[in-house]
Every structure is written in structure tokens, then in C-alpha cells.
Amino acid sequence: MKKIGIIGAGISGLYIANLFKKNPKYQVSIFDKKNSLNIDEGYGVQLSINSVKFLNEIGFNKLEKNEKFNPEKINFYSKKDEDKICELDISEFNSNDCKYTTLKRSTLINFLKKDLEDLIKTNYSVSKIDQEQEKIKLSFENKETHECDYLIISDGVFSKSRNLVSNKKIQPKYNDTLAIRLSLIHI
């Protein structure tokens, strides 16, 4: 059995862990630096039909309909004068089982972690990553170590682990754009 180490218990880390968990040839361990997973209600997520297609492979299509929303269009407005620039009909890209979807980030995280609770280790901040022969050795700030055959780094845009592997500090690049997303509910 091959051991898979996943650094980061966000959306991508939990998604890939679900895929590996389905295969008995792999043993998965997920490490996250925080003391608990962030399931605050305040954030929303937009899922393209391609991402919904992949999430359906792990049961996303069984999520209750009242926990997600399938918008039909996106309106684009000018920041400067608040005029509507255009409207995009996103429903034309939908299929019966894969629709452009919005939902709370907390709903998506709860869905992704529901079968992984026993695999997630919190308060595990990586301090060192070493390649030793055929194994990868992870050292953590809590003085614990873990060995794995394969390592998946998914700890976000400000990834400490990526910097440890590349031996240099990699900074995200920004292009001064902003996206504001909201749903208007008609009463």
C-alpha cells in the first residue's frame, strides 16, 4: 500500500484525498497547519461545469438541492460608473448533470471532509521536507514526523511547502483586478 501525504485541507486537498480514498491501494494522510478547518459561513464559491463534473465523481450530485444554487446568467458592471457592460447566459453551457453552481464554501468543505475526518490532522505546520531514498519525510513544527511515498502540496497561494520544496520564496502575482460576486433574491 502506497502512502499519500497531502499538505493542506482546503478544497483541493480534500478533493484529491476523496479520490485516493476510493482506491484501496493508497493510504491517505492530510495535514493542515490550522487548529481546525475553516467552515465560516461568510464565503461563497462558484463552480464551473467542469469542476462539478469532477465533484460528481465523489458524490457531489447527491448534495441537497437547497444547499446549492444554479444561476442562469452573470451580469458584468463597470466599476467606474456602475453601468451594465454585458450579460453572459451561463445556462447554455449546462448539461443535465453538470450545471454552473454556487454554494457556501462551508457547504463544500463539509461535503468534502465528511468521509475524511479520521484522515485529517490539524496543527501540523510543515517545517522541513526531505527526500530519503524512496520515501519523503515530512517534519512538522510540533516535532512530529511522517513518511510518505507521494506528496501532494495543496496549501494555497501563499504555500510554505512549495517554498520548502523549491528552496526559494515564491510570491503570488497580482494584476489589479477585482471580482465581486453576489446573488440577488427577489422578494
Please state what every model-predicted region is.
Residues 185-187:
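Conserved small/polar residues in nucleotide/adenosyl-binding loops
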